[in-house]
Amino acid sequence: MVLLSSLNVLLILFPGFNTLDMNGPYEVLRKSGLSQNFNVTVASETDITTSIEGLHARRDIAIDHALVQQLPDFDVLVVPGGVAGPGSAVEAQAANITSPFMTLIKEFADVAPLSTARPRVLLSICTGAIFLGTMGVFNDRYCTTHWKALTDLQKSVNDAAARTHGRPGTVVPARFVDSGNNTSGVRIISSGGVSAGLDASLYLVKSLFGEEEALDTAEMLDYAWHKTDGVVLDGMRYY
């Protein structure tokens, strides 16, 4: 599918996010079509959100229950990660499953596209996959994350499946995984660690606007795109 109109992207932040997890996808999407293909909105629960590296990011819009009601207005949701493991910012954020941040992720995954001409995509970057796994988004799906967090992601996936009476997903090591559309028609893509978010984002550009557009974007960024290092599923077959 090659789209002719621009898409609205929501990129959500939490305290302790990884800077490249945010900036990598942001720059890819903003450079695609020289900013013509994607309109990117940054959201967080606080006006200023500080990354694990100390960068202060100002939001465009608040993550609250009102924003959850506006999710049909957005075509793509990007969820960055950060340091995972016991006592980490990712663990603390994932533990609060009723927060607006976590609720927004699950609600986006459940909102069907308004039309086939405007697909919906949920893209996790690095350990942002743990948030999706915790909310059951990866039930019965393949997914990936940073290589050091593969076990953490599998645990979150297994725990969510038990809590929601679903079938656990399968975690695999890869630069990115496109597991196809869920039952609501939302495409679920997860990336490996940090810089792999660039590859997943370029893959997203390719999927929506064509390979030439993705190659032009990679050239503009002077980035060697690992375009064949991902896993793309045909239905639920892994190959």
Specify the residue positions occupied by each region the protein language model found.
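N-terminal beta1-alpha1 cap of cysteine-dependent amidohydrolase-like domains
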Residues: 2-73
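Active-site-adjacent pocket-lining segments in enzyme domains
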Residues: 2-11, 67-239
